[in-house]
Amino acid sequence: MLEVSEEAIQNALGASYVQDDSFVPIKKIAKGNEEKEAQLLTIPGVMLNDSQDRVYPLGAAAGHLTGYVQAVTAEDLEKLENKGYHANSVIGRSGLEQAYEEELRPVDGTRIIIADETGNTIETLAYQPAQNGKDVRVTIDAEVQKTAYDQFAQDPEQAAAMNPKTGEVLALVSTPGYDPNEFVLGMSDARWNALNEDASNPLMNRFVNTWVPGSTFKGITAAVGVDAGIINPDENLGYVGLSWQKDASWEIIM
């Protein structure tokens, strides 16, 4: 039901911090799936608890653009612990989440207290309130983004749409894509392997790749030449009867 192995569940329940009355998180599920929630609650010992996580409304249509967040790894902590990251932190892994990690990341609150044997606070020694991350506003039009994504569907393509008057980017699409919500909720090994081994490379962000413009750039250089007065638009620069053919100097040496 949750695509979590029995071994993983036993490992979580056997963690050193777990007490008889502890709530041990096993798996995140999307809120609102009432049927699954009802099925889970029929299992003895299972409880549901709300948590605050990223939600990506456009799903796969903007997956490569938004990117996703994940829990920090041990390697992350080695590099970032002095910046306030800890074992329960999340970090942007790709897309806008990664590019604007410093702006989007909230600051955890801290409270240091003296408590009695029953856990009641006697004195607060230090307190730092939590701070939300900043809002980052983009010019992406959700409808344009979804339409562009649907046009290409499963084809390995990329597309961009801009407002020609302002230069604002209205859509950035890479297909096929992936749903970033899967990374937030956690995916099974089988699902991860399927994404990784898919021949169409849904994890590849094609719109950030570089592409050689080739002959499509000739029109631009010609326009610049005409605008600068170097090229006469009425002059025929074509040469009849001449052609180019590669010679031995173009031989590929393996």
Where are these regions (language model features)?
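Short, internal active-site loops enriched in acidic
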Residues: K165-T166, S243
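Residue-level preference for non-acidic, small/hydrophobic
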Residues: A38, L65, A148, G167, ...
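Short hydrophobic alpha-helical segments used for membrane anchoring or interfacial signaling
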Residues: A159-P164
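Residue-level signal for well-ordered, solvent-exposed loop/turn and beta-edge residues enriched
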Residues: N120, G167-E168
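A glycine-rich, coil/turn loop motif that links secondary-structure elements
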Residues: E168, T210-P213
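Short, glycine/proline-biased beta-turn/loop segments that scaffold the active-site neighborhood
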Residues: V173-T175, F183-G186, V212-M254
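Extracytoplasmic/periplasmic proteins that interact with beta-lactams or build/remodel peptidoglycan
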Residues: M1-Q158, V173, Y178-N205, T210
